[in-house]
UniProtKB/Swiss-Prot annotation:
Signal peptide bounds: none
Catalytic reactions on record: ATP + H2O + a folded polypeptide = ADP + phosphate + an unfolded polypeptide
Main location: cytoplasm
Native source organism of the sequence: Bacillus pumilus (strain SAFR-032)
Name recorded for this polypeptide: Chaperonin GroEL
SUPFAM superfamilies: GroEL apical domain-like, GroEL equatorial domain-like, GroEL-intermediate domain like
Length: 544
């Protein structure tokens, strides 16, 4: 296919038009008085959102060169979302400011390579400044503040804070759609996996159709059990103790299952059989997790252990186990806390090493089940459109809160970026490198300018006053007051602000040093040009 090529100024200008088109659509959502953007959906109702990355992903421009510019800025939003989970609009605003100011200077004769060096130097100093003013996040109240700011909703903030308090910072918090109008929190304590009882005859509560075992012994094996003789010795020891038994195996069937059911119905002893969770290597890893959590041993031939010679001391214990048709929950396993901590650290190391997103997600789930539990935030709303928008906001708030716990918080509302202004301004450089530093200085003001603009105020006046205020004091656009941002709970996670600045600078530097842009040439008239001639097929009616 033939290519269309544009060079230097013409190429950069075309890309800038695309950058502006996307950034102008995204930046109207910034701040407490930001507006919404409506996105057309081919099927169903339109999506109304103020989430920067969602808007950026939807934008596709007709002109190929402009579209490349738009896609580069969409990449800034997307990358920031991947790393920090929020701050996508801030990143887009910063990228647009750097690209626009940079192109002005390059057009006026500045050397793009020198400008790029200046941008990189200034961003490095700005990041050091951010870490200096960053404060660690402590306590439920601080977590609630971060979440409330991101979701623009105090109720959501307190829900997320409660969820993180209940399941710990490593816990899994999932967001689901609720059937009702209210948003609520549901927490599953202990370890839960998606396998239910092998037979409905094993239930202890026929109303709820669940089996509840108090202080049970837990036999964990990766073998298939078909013959009751294999587990009879250990079964007799459990019966003597007068305790119920949870049997987790690859499968329990045939005579073994029938014997367990018959004895349960007769009231001889209470045993519930459950299939092992997961598949393949992941199954073995999850069984090992359960054995660490309950203080038992995994009975596997890999370790030379045999079911027939299993002693009661090799079984795990828990204060309670609840088994339903689809799930098994182990509450308060009796495992050694030092061993559980070691296992948690081992899984954390695997999370850091893996490159697969799927593996990472599964490892995070295992980590959560060992470290705390699983919380589900059920989002409710009056209409489907509102539900989708609310769910997106809560996802952003959750990501934002996690980022805050990780790297601390800085003053929100664009204040932190202006707080590092003086540190960046102190850089001594010459020529085009200094031009690059000046571009970053101008860009640091842009988020607060946009927040003020969206609130119907003049950004320049607020920026000038902010530069002269002490660190931490900023402008609250929601109330039009000057306040101590951290005291008032108007905060941003350091990780979000850092990622936004880094990613914006990276793409801006790349775009400024672009000298040629290549795109597919649109085909003249398109390939469908011959189609109208098919009208002659109408004569085929005579063939009947």
């Amino acid at each position: 296919m033939a290519k269309d090529i544009k060079f230097s100024e013409e190429a950069r200008r075309a890309m800038l038009r695309g950058v502006d088109a996307l950034a102008d659509a995204v930046k109207v959502t910034l701040g407490p008085k930001g507006r919404n953007v409506v996105l057309e959906k081919k099927f169903g109702s339109p999506l109304i959102t103020n989430d920067g990355v969602t808007i950026a992903k939807e934008i596709e421009l007709e002109d190929a060169f402009e579209n490349m510019g738009a896609k580069l800025v969409a990449e800034v939003a997307s990358k920031t979302n991947d790393v920090a989970g929020d701050g996508t609009t801030t990143a887009t605003v910063l990228a647009q400011a750097m690209i626009r100011e940079g192109l002005k200077n390059v057009t006026a004769g500045a050397n793009p390579v020198g400008v790029r060096k200046g941008i990189e130097e200034a961003v490095k100093v700005a990041l050091e400044g951010l870490h200096e003013i960053s404060k660690p996040i402590e306590g439920k109240e601080s977590i609630a503040q971060v979440a409330s700011i991101s979701a623009a909703d105090e109720e959501v903030g307190s829900l997320i804070a409660e969820a993180m308090e209940r399941v710990g910072n490593d816990g899994v918090i999932t967001i689901e759609e609720s059937k009702g109008f209210t948003t609520e929190l549901e927490v599953v304590e202990g370890m839960q996996f998606d396998r239910g009882y092998a037979s409905p005859y094993m239930v202890t509560d026929s109303d709820k159709m669940e089996a509840v075992l108090e202080n049970p012994y837990i036999l964990i094996t990766d073998k298939k059990i078909t013959n009751i003789q294999e587990i009879l010795p250990v079964l007799e020891q459990v019966v003597q103790q007068g305790k119920p038994l949870l049997l987790i195996a690859e499968d329990v069937e045939g005579e073994a299952l029938a014997t367990l059911v018959v004895n349960k119905l007769r009231g001889t002893f209470n045993a519930v059989a459950v299939k092992a969770p997961g598949f393949g290597d992941r199954r073995k890893a999850m069984l090992e997790d359960i054995s660490v959590l309950t203080g038992g041993e995994l009975i596997t031939e890999d370790l030379g252990l045999d079911l027939k010679s299993t002693e009661i001391g090799q079984l795990g214990r828990a204060s309670k186990v609840v088994v339903t048709k689809e799930n098994t929950t182990i509450v308060e396993g009796s495992g050694d806390s030092a061993q559980i901590a070691a296992r948690v650290n081992q899984i954390r190391a695997q999370v850091e090493e893996t490159t697969s997103e799927f593996d990472k997600e599964k490892l995070q789930e295992r980590l959560a089940k060992l470290a705390g539990g699983v919380a589900v935030i059920k989002v409710g709303a009056a209409t489907e459109t509102e539900l989708k928008e609310r769910k997106l906001r809560i996802e952003d708030a959750l990501n934002s809160t996690r980022a805050a716990v990780e790297e601390g918080i800085v003053s929100g509302g664009g204040t932190a970026l202006v707080n590092v202004y003086k540190k960046v301004a102190s850089i001594e450089a010459d020529g085009d490198v200094q031009t690059g530093v000046n571009i970053v200085l101008r860009s640091l003001e842009e988020p607060i300018r946009q927040i003020a603009h969206n609130a119907g105020l003049e950004g320049s006046v607020i920026v000038e006053r902010l530069k002269n205020e002490e660190i931490g004091v900023g402008f609250n656009a929601a109330t039009n007051e000057w306040v101590n941002m951290i005291e008032k709970g108007i905060v941003d996670p350091t990780k979000v602000t850092r990622s936004a600045l880094q990613n914006a600078a990276s793409v801006a530097a790349m775009l400024l040093t672009t000298e040629a842009v290549v795109a597919d040439k649109p085909e003249e008239g398109g390939s469908g040009g011959g189609m109208p001639d098919m009208g002659g097929m109408g004569g085929m009616g005579g063939m009947m």
